[in-house]
Amino acid sequence: FENRSKAYSKYFDKETGFEVSDMGNIYHAVLENFAGKLAESNLTWWNFSEDFALKTVKESVEAYAATYGETVLYSSARNEYAITRMSRILTRTVLTLQQHLKQGSFQPDDYELSFRFAEELDSIHVDLSEEEKMHLQGRIDRIDVSEDAEHVYVKVIDYKSGNKKFDLAALYYGLQLQLVVYMNAAMELESRKHPDKEIVPAALLYYHIDDPTIETPVELTDEQINEQILAKLRMNGVVNSDPEVVERLDHYLQDKSAVIPVEKKKDGSFSARSGILSREEMQLVSAYVDAKIRDIGREILDGKIAANPYEKGNEEACTYCAYKKVCGFDGSIPGYEKRQLEDLDKQTLMQRMQETMEA
């Protein structure tokens, strides 16, 4: 759906093969395997040691790489180094994710949840007409929950090998729907597990899988270095602005959280740099994404495949598109034009979503 919102022809064409530069599959597989190894070792995300992380990640990366035999991953010294680098990055990742969990009261509830194993969920079956139904495909990297006597708070995390940023305007235009779709499915799943409790969306977050370097003109202690690395690996996304939810996500938040995209001003209110939405705004965004997916699905079935990719400021769908020859778009030919997308602020976006839902 996001590809179709960028340029219609991108929906129909898929690339095959494995690129060394695209390590996403390995990252996801190793992180899923790590969670399984914790359970096998009677450990949790809170109490595993750094030595356990180093050993488990290294073995998992090497085992996964071995499944490719003497193909791409071992085809050169450079690619062999990539395996070592992945081990380092993923060790940093599991240690950082451990620290994130220790900051709050959430615990992982599901990993790599494929929609194929959630066939009963209404949120992944979209009625386009009385005769036509669309089935969504996807995989939720991680669902975390925090519970009390009456509520289940839900956090959805999507692992990214690139530095993905949550963009409400991109969501509005149909370019960034995935994370909300995952939250809708996770909310429904938790409601079936806990029919006697209220299910509350807590956070929709991207985690950048990376091992950042710290450049400083002065010598730092190991603790200071780790603090700066943790700050660079703070999750990006949107958080429920309810103080109870924020406190469950980060018990130690004072002025700027090290784990979620939330900052506070001196008076205790959230700063404009915070990625927050109210409970009502989250519900609106959820409903809007459902409607947007239904509209896009209807257009795909109706055969609307005009070559009119989007353009928003300096960003455009064609910049890194591998399907230009398939698309045939040529701006120099009369009749070809790109969709110009406005750069809108949060208040305007929420108002337009509300108007769309009321129409």
Would you name each region that the model predicts?
Residues 1-359:
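Structural signature of nuclease core domains in nucleic-acid processing machines
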